[in-house]
Regions:
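Protein kinase glycine-rich loop
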Residues: 14-20, 25
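AlphaC helix of the eukaryotic protein kinase fold
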Residues: 43-64
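A short, aromatic-enriched beta-strand patch in the conserved N-lobe beta-sheet
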Residues: 76-78
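Conserved short submotifs of the Hanks-type protein kinase catalytic core
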Residues: 82-96, 100
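Activation segment signature within eukaryotic-like protein kinase domains
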Residues: 115-116
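Protein kinase catalytic-loop region centered on the HRD/HxD motif
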Residues: 119-131
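Conserved catalytic-loop aspartate of Hanks-type protein kinases
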Residues: 193
Length: 266
């Protein structure tokens, strides 16, 4: 089934760039300034308080961080006539790092490290603003027109406040990059983001997420949950300090894990 027809005053919809379980992303032209943008339209209407909270959470989180060089800027947001929410973001013609891994495999170690440093800086800035991302993965790291990388999709983002609901269903997780405690519905924390960040850097280095077989065999959720408890095995050819940082950031138990994205960056 194709995406629903979308019309938005002030924008010319050009083509579908991608479609996932919860949203469709279009290439569009912002007529007032003649700028090409990415228009992300949710496939669900804002019919429940939970849906409205989710959308406001994403917009607020992304808006707080839009000035960061490694966060995709948000230009506009709102609700269509049929109650589907939308966001207008910077168009990143280089696609995602997930796309690149699929096409080319692992990245050179220096490039993976440099990308990791930039993303860690973005995550540290998010945490300093009280924002958790909760879905860091190569598919949510975009490459802009200048070749820079930036984190996008704060759809699961949470801003911790006393009494606020922070839970998320298993169906909304990306199992290969989610921290082990997320499968047991533990409260999200900065340590969870650090795990997902480290898992993303690991995938850039190896071409696959942590604990995944080299032959590409798919794992069931039950198998992955068990493998998440396995200790980190050093990657050959990496400087000892790099392996140490990954080992500390990928610890299965949050209490034993590096929880400061700034420290991981260093």
């Amino acid at each position: 089934m194709g995406p629903e027809r979308t019309d938005l005053p002030g924008y010319e919809i050009q083509e579908v760039l991608g479609q996932g379980g919860f949203a469709t992303v279009y290439r569009a032209r912002q007529l007032a300034v003649g700028r090409e943008v990415a228009l992300k339209v949710d496939s669900r209407v804002l019919s429940t308080p939970r849906d409205r909270q989710r959308f406001l959470r994403e917009v607020t989180a992304a808006g707080q961080l839009s000035g960061h060089p490694h966060v995709v800027p948000v230009y506009d947001a709102g609700v269509l006539a049929d109650n589907r929410p939308y966001m207008v973001l910077e168009l990143c013609p280089g696609g995602s790092l997930g796309d690149r891994l699929h096409r080319q495999g692992a990245l050179p170690a220096k490039e993976a490290r440099d990308i990791g440093v930039g993303l860690a800086d973005a995550v540290a800035a998010a945490h300093a603003s009280g924002v958790l991302h909760r879905d860091i993965k190569p598919g949510n790291v975009m490459v802009n027109r200048y070749g820079g990388v930036a984190l996008t999709d704060f759809g699961l983002a949470a801003m911790p406040r006393p009494g606020r609901e922070l839970s998320v269903t298993r169906e909304a997780l990306t199992p290969a990059y989610a921290p082990p405690e997320a499968f047991h519905m533990a409260d999200p924390s900065p340590a969870g983001d650090v795990y997902s960040l480290a898992a993303t850097v690991y995938a850039l280095l190896c071409g696959r997420p942590p604990h995944y077989p080299e032959d590409g065999t798919q794992l069931s959720l039950a198998e992955l949950i068990v493998r998440h408890t396995w200790p980190y095995a050093d990657l050959p050819g990496l400087p000892p300090a790099f392996n140490t940082a990954l080992r500390h950031a990928l610890a299965a138990a949050p209490a034993h894990r590096l929880s400061d994205a700034g420290a991981f960056r260093e």
